[in-house]
Swiss-Prot record:
GO biological process, one term: positive regulation of cell size
Name of protein: Auxin-binding protein T92
Glycosylation sites per record: N117
Gene3D superfamilies: Jelly Rolls (2.60.120.10)
Location of this chain's protein in the cell: Endoplasmic reticulum lumen
Signal peptide: 1-20
Species for this entry: Nicotiana tabacum (Common tobacco)
Length: 187
């Protein structure tokens, strides 16, 4: 009997280890995104799930996120050396964007209203911020980035010099797994 329990515990432990959230081992090929856990990574008002990613899933060219912003939540003012595409699933908000330029700081951003079924892209190194300006409803987006994992430069405000922006790498949702994942840059 004790031997059966030990075998059962060993099988359970192996299956759990194989399905680690820092690995694709044990994950089904087809998954329901509404059943994937979302976390806020210490950022109240944000729920994030990496649907397919570099650090978590071994993706090399793109990364896909599902993000939900509570009313009033906003991303930091930031830029990154990758392209980014958003698809708004629900809610409304505002995109603030300053095109990449040769000035020393971002300057006054352009404002764009975003809404369900709208899409927008952020060019490489354009400083931007997404804000749920709705009062009642969450803003939910699918977010696709190129060249993962993302290296984010954050600004305190729109007048902060580019050279003073603070690098955040690995980013919040990559921190735990980035340390445990060996990165190979070949096919």
């Amino acid at each position: 009997m004790a031997r059966h329990i030990i075998i059962l515990v060993a099988v359970f432990w192996f299956a759990t280890a194989e399905a680690s959230h820092c690995s694709i081992n044990g994950l089904p090929l087809v998954r329901n995104i509404s059943e994937l856990p979302q976390e806020n990574y210490g950022r109240s008002g944000l729920s994030h799930t990496t649907i397919a990613g570099s650090v978590l899933h071994g993706m090399k060219e793109i990364e896909v996120w599902l993000q939900t912003f509570a009313p009033g939540f906003r991303t930091p003012i930031h830029r990154h050396s990758c392209e980014e595409i958003f698809i708004v699933l629900k809610g409304q908000g505002t995109l603030y964007l300053t095109p990449s330029s040769h000035s020393k700081y971002p300057g006054n951003p352009q404002e764009f209203h975003i809404f369900p079924n709208s899409t927008f892209h952020i060019p490489v190194n354009d400083v931007h911020q997404v804000w749920n300006t709705g009062e009642q409803e969450d803003l939910q987006v699918l977010d696709v980035i190129s060249r993962p994992p993302v290296k984010v430069f954050m600004y305190d405000d729109w007048s902060m010099p580019h050279t003073a922006a603070k690098l955040k790498f690995p980013y919040y949702w990559d921190e735990e797994c980035y340390q445990t994942t060996s990165r190979k840059d070949e096919l």
